[in-house]
Amino acid sequence: NMLGEREPEIYGSDTLHDHVKEAKRVTNKFGYELRHYQSNNEGDLVDQIQNAREKHIGIIINPGALTPYGWSLHDALAASEGVIIEMHLSNPNQREPWRHTSVVAPVANGSIVGFGIQGYELSIRALHQIIEDDDK
């Protein structure tokens, strides 16, 4: 949340609505249905991940400030089925040292970082490619 308002020099001027709209455009190209969820509450995110376990083919997650210490996200994602892509608008490795370690990365198929709003398209394309490769 607060995208487009908070630190636009880092996160850009696109709003959360803009990001979701772009992600839906890309998922529609591949014939997928996007289910978007945003919360500042880690427990709510865990609930969503656990509820999606057998209903979704993949999860693209931007853990934000939970990246270095969201161990409950790590555990929920580890128990998930399907593809997991970690995505960040900025590149955490170019920022403060406390942002450099991700507890999500070890359970993700891959990470897309530093591409702003384009990161969602890249993440969806990566998710699609992994699914296609698994179907071969």
Regions found by a protein language model. Give the residues of each.
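Short acidic/histidine-rich motifs immediately flanking catalytic phosphotransfer sites
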Residues: 52-59
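Short Gly/Thr/Asp-enriched flexible loops that form oxyanion-binding sites at enzyme active sites
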Residues: 70-81
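Short, structured coil segments at secondary-structure junctions
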Residues: 30, 80, 107-108
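Short, glycine-/small-residue-rich phosphate/pyrophosphate-handling segment
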Residues: 35-36, 85, 94-136
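Short glycine-rich anion-binding loops that position phosphate/pyrophosphate groups of nucleotides
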Residues: 1-2, 64-67, 90-92
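Short acidic active-site motifs
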Residues: 44-48
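Glycine-rich phosphate/diphosphate-binding loop of Rossmann-like nucleotide-binding domains
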Residues: 1-30
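Short beta->alpha junction loops
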Residues: 33-43
